[in-house]
């Protein structure tokens, strides 16, 4: 899938991510999890934040590569896991088309699967999510961005007009 499928952009700041993860944790706080499995790389930071909020000390990873920048390609399992997920919380930043989610569900069919953000195509594959975003929306996560100087608007307009 190419960048052409994205017509909107949603930028998530660090503050927004913390608020969203904490809100998701409010839905999970009554449950008792043996551990957390983060889907790398996108699920690492949400999993760390969730582990802190739920006081879960055991965190593992399943490593699947599915994106090259904004192009979604075939799945490559780089590290699997040796249990069915019973009693475990499975965490990713988002579910998009569901390709990664399907593969991980096969590996960990008994895990409780949560994502912070969900798109319509992948939403049925997770047990819980916090925020739904449009299928054609590219989500910019804070770990993918840097701070850069932006020229004042008046200077941008003047340089464009000259």
Curated annotation (Swiss-Prot):
Residues that, per the record, bind 5-phospho-alpha-D-ribose 1-diphosphate: 41-42, 92-100
Keywords: Cell inner membrane, Cell membrane, Glycosyltransferase, Magnesium, Membrane, Metal-binding, Purine salvage, Transferase
Residues that, per the record, bind GMP: 96-100, 138-139
Subcellular localization: Cell inner membrane
Residues that, per the record, bind guanine: 96, 139
Pathway(s) annotated for this protein in UniProt: Purine metabolism; GMP biosynthesis via salvage pathway; GMP from guanine: step 1/1; Purine metabolism; XMP biosynthesis via salvage pathway; XMP from xanthine: step 1/1
Name of this protein: Xanthine-guanine phosphoribosyltransferase
Taxonomic lineage of the native organism: Bacteria, Pseudomonadati, Pseudomonadota, Gammaproteobacteria, Oceanospirillales
Name of the gene encoding the protein in the UniProt record: gpt
């Amino acid at each position: 899938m190419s960048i052409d499928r994205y017509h909107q952009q949603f930028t998530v700041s660090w503050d927004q991510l913390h608020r969203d993860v904490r809100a998701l944790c409010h839905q999970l706080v009554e449950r008792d999890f043996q551990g957390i499995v983060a889907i790398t790389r996108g699920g690492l930071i949400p999993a760390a934040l969730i582990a802190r909020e739920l006081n879960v000390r055991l965190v593992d990873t399943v490593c699947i590569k599915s994106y090259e920048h904004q192009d979604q390609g075939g799945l490559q399992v780089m590290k699997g896991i040796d249990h069915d997920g019973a009693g475990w919380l499975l965490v990713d930043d988002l579910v998009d088309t569901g390709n990664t989610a399907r593969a991980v569900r096969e590996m960990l069919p008994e895990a409780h699967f949560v994502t912070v953000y969900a798109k319509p195509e992948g939403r049925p594959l997770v047990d819980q999510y916090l925020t739904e975003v449009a299928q054609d929306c590219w989500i910019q996560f804070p770990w993918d961005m840097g701070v850069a100087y932006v020229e004042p608007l008046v200077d941008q307009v003047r340089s464009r007009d000259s």
